[in-house]
Amino acid sequence: MAGGSTGERPFSDIITSIRYWVIHSITIPSLFIAGWLFVSTGLAYDVFGTPRPNEYFTQERTQIPLVNDRFNAKQELEDLL
């Protein structure tokens, strides 16, 4: 091995190999499709607790739910809900 070499396979060898592209031609589109399904089915809203676009404003509350005092934020949030 040459000085300073970590013994790892060179990146140029990896990306020019058939094995690399066989594996990644499956995994990259699969990750894209999984992400698209995660968002389009609404599961992302449920997992992260984010309100859906039609849930930001209710019939009773038509203004922005804004917290003004960070020291009393819990009380302000309870009042907003």
Swiss-Prot record:
Record's cofactor remark: With its partner (PsbF) binds heme. PSII binds additional chlorophylls, carotenoids and specific lipids.
UniProt subcellular location: Plastid, Chloroplast thylakoid membrane
Gene3D superfamilies on file: Photosystem II cytochrome b559, alpha subunit
Gene Ontology biological-process annotations: photosynthetic electron transport chain
GO molecular function, one term: electron transfer activity
Residue spans crossing the bilayer: 22-36
One GO CC annotation: photosystem II reaction center
Pfam families reported in the protein's UniProt record: Cytochrom_B559 (PF00283), Cytochrom_B559a (PF00284)
InterPro entries the UniProt entry points to: PSII_cyt_b559_asu, PSII_cyt_b559_asu_sf, PSII_cyt_b559_CS, PSII_cyt_b559_N, PSII_cytb559_asu_lum
Main localization category: plastid
Cofactor(s) required for function per UniProt: heme b
Claim: Transport is one of the keywords in the record: yes
Binding site for heme: 24
Alphabetically ordered keywords of this record: Chloroplast, Electron transport, Heme, Iron, Membrane, Metal-binding, Photosynthesis, Photosystem II, Plastid, Thylakoid, Transmembrane, Transmembrane helix, Transport
Protein's membrane topology: Single-pass membrane protein
Keyword Repressor: no
PROSITE patterns: CYTOCHROME_B559
Subunit structure: Heterodimer of an alpha subunit and a beta subunit. PSII is composed of 1 copy each of membrane proteins PsbA, PsbB, PsbC, PsbD, PsbE, PsbF, PsbH, PsbI, PsbJ, PsbK, PsbL, PsbM, PsbT, PsbX, PsbY, PsbZ, Psb30/Ycf12, at least 3 peripheral proteins of the oxygen-evolving complex and a large number of cofactors. It forms dimeric complexes.
Protein purpose: This b-type cytochrome is tightly associated with the reaction center of photosystem II (PSII). PSII is a light-driven water:plastoquinone oxidoreductase that uses light energy to abstract electrons from H(2)O, generating O(2) and a proton gradient subsequently used for ATP formation. It consists of a core antenna complex that captures photons, and an electron transfer chain that converts photonic excitation into a charge separation.
Family, similarity comment: Belongs to the PsbE/PsbF family.
Protein name: Cytochrome b559 subunit alpha
Taxonomic classification: Eukaryota, Rhodophyta, Bangiophyceae, Cyanidiales, Cyanidiaceae
